[in-house]
Amino acid sequence: CHCIAVREKLLAMKETLGIPEFGGPWFCTTLRPGEVTVNMTRTAGNAIDNRNFTAAECRLREDVFKIARIFKENFEEFKNSYVTTVAVHAGIRETRRIKGVHTITAEEYVNAYKYPDSISRGAHPIDIHVAAGAEQSVTFLKKAAYVPYRALIAEDFSNLLVAGRCISADKTSFASLRVQASCMGVGQAAGVAAAQCIKAGVTVQKADIHNLIEELKKLGAII
């Protein structure tokens, strides 16, 4: 859950206590009584530069323990808290994407435009985080959006199919498509398409869309 009261108190103390950049915070319970996960740390960086990304990860790990101390000292609910686990690596919201045969636009995504080659759906809010500060823009979708097969095909390559955060989408639609559920749906479609193309002896540009969609439906994909 997103705790607004905690957020407001943190923002009020940010300058005085030197609180690192943060988002949320969002809290989730686990299977262990009294344990919560805290989704909060945030930093800007260039994740395609290994040195820059390494520096960002080091900074974030330091921030975890700074924030843990601030919670322990300033929130009654956390007075006996301690850190048990830190994420293996930093989550990356955005790096490079392909220029596909079709690029999903914000207008198409928000209005749930159904393409003739739709192979997956996206329902996560359009969630844009600022590079610096605690703000974010959130737009909830009225209807689950669609993802076309063409957005998985790289425009300038004869036989390249991608999935996950690399698909062809503008910045706004990508802010929803980047999450795990969307990546799983697109990944399933890409895998089935690749298998069918190999069996048929054709490139990914020549995939039989009807057969692809029918097979995905048989597998229980949400289309």
What is the predicted role of each segment?
Residues 1-223:
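Flavin (FAD/FMN)-binding glycine-rich loop and adjacent Rossmann-like elements that form
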